[in-house]
Structures are given as C-alpha cells and as structure tokens.
Swiss-Prot record:
Highest taxon in the source lineage: Eukaryota
A GO BP entry: root development
Pfam families: AUX_IAA
Domain PB1, first and last residues per copy: 82-171
Gene of this entry: IAA30
Keywords: Auxin signaling pathway, Nucleus, Repressor, Transcription, Transcription regulation
Organism of derivation: Arabidopsis thaliana (Mouse-ear cress)
Subunit structure: Homodimers and heterodimers.
Major subcellular site: nucleus
Function in brief: Aux/IAA proteins are short-lived transcriptional factors that function as repressors of early auxin response genes at low auxin concentrations. Repression is thought to result from the interaction with auxin response factors (ARFs), proteins that bind to the auxin-responsive promoter element (AuxRE). Formation of heterodimers with ARF proteins may alter their ability to modulate early auxin response genes expression.
Biased amino acid composition, Low complexity: 1-18
Induction: By auxin.
Motif (EAR-like (transcriptional repression)): 35-39
Lineage, broadest ranks: Eukaryota, Viridiplantae, Streptophyta, Embryophyta, Tracheophyta
Record-given protein name: Auxin-responsive protein IAA30
Region called Disordered, residue ranges: 1-28
Length: 172
C-alpha cells in the first residue's frame, strides 16, 4: 500500500529533483525558518518563509510581540476603569476582591462589604455605633500603614489604598 502522490507540486520539489530532501542550497534558509514556525530572528534579507507566502519582517521578534500585546491588553484593562483590591475578613479563610472604581463612595463600599461578608461593618463615620457583633474596616496604604476607612476623602483613599481588612471590633 503506497501513498498516492498529490497532483500539485511545490516550487521546492520541482526545482530540486537532484537533492534527496528536495531542498536546494538557495532555499535552505527559507526551509529552516519554516521549521521554526515562520519566525525569523535577525535575518539579513528581512523576510521569512510562512507557508509559501513571503512577508516582510519588521524587526520585532516573538518575545517583543508578546510584550507589546500584553502592554496593550493591560492598557485596555486599565482604560475600562477598574481598580480591584483584596478584602480579608478576620476569621474567614478566603479573601475576596472588590472593584473600588465601580463604587460611588464610602457608603457604597460599606453596603457592598456588608452584603458580601454578611456582617455589620463600621467605619470612621459610624465609629461610636459599636456593638458586640460589629466589625471595623481598615485599609493598608502605600507605605503599609493600617488606617481607618473614612478618615480621608474618597479620592485620596482611592489613590492610597492597597488592601482592605475587616477586623472584629473589640470593646475595652
């Protein structure tokens, strides 16, 4: 059972009958780049071989292309308008993330966290309303200092917050 021969022949086959591999010395460079999935790094001619089509090579390698694509993707994500921070609650082993830019201030933040963790959460505005089952919301700023949520204006909070922590309110 032999294999049937295709009626179409490539330019490499027809031009190189004497070479057992079907490759002439002039086409060796193109075949070697084809074996590297069409990626050419530092070719002097500025072209690479890709399935029979010759394309101009713009000097950007695969690694550089990936970095450019990742940067564009990150810029795209940032332009959407999201700013996620981690939220951990004392006694809960798994933290969550919350998008602060989707909220309209401290009241939205507290309402969302109350619902998310099913807890009564206090912040600077409600500091005097402490009960046995209440929790206090604090945040770590750029320097790593823990501050009470609500002590600074919302915009300043957004520029300095790195993560949130919900702790039990202790009575003294």
């Amino acid at each position: 059972m032999g294999r049937g021969r295709s009626s179409s022949s490539s330019s490499i086959e027809s031009s190189c009958k004497s070479n057992p591999f079907g490759v002439s010395s002039s086409n060796t460079r193109n075949l070697s780049t084809d074996l590297r999935l069409g990626l050419s790094f530092g070719s002097s001619s500025g072209q690479y071989y890709n399935g029979g089509d010759n394309h101009e090579y713009d000097g950007v390698g695969a690694a550089e292309e990936m970095m450019i694509m990742e940067e564009e993707e990150q810029n795209e994500c940032n332009s959407v308008g999201s700013f996620y921070v981690k939220v951990n609650m004392e006694g809960v082993p798994i933290g969550r993330k919350i998008d602060l830019l989707s909220l309209n201030g401290y009241h939205d933040l507290i309402t969302t966290l109350d619902y998310m963790f099913n807890a009564s959460i206090l912040w600077a505005e409600e500091e005097d309303m402490c009960s046995e089952k209440s929790h206090v919301l604090t945040y770590a700023d750029k320097e790593g200092d823990w501050m009470m949520v609500g002590d600074v204006p919302w915009e300043m909070f957004l520029s300095s917050v790195r993560r949130l922590k919900i702790s039990r309110a202790y009575h003294y």
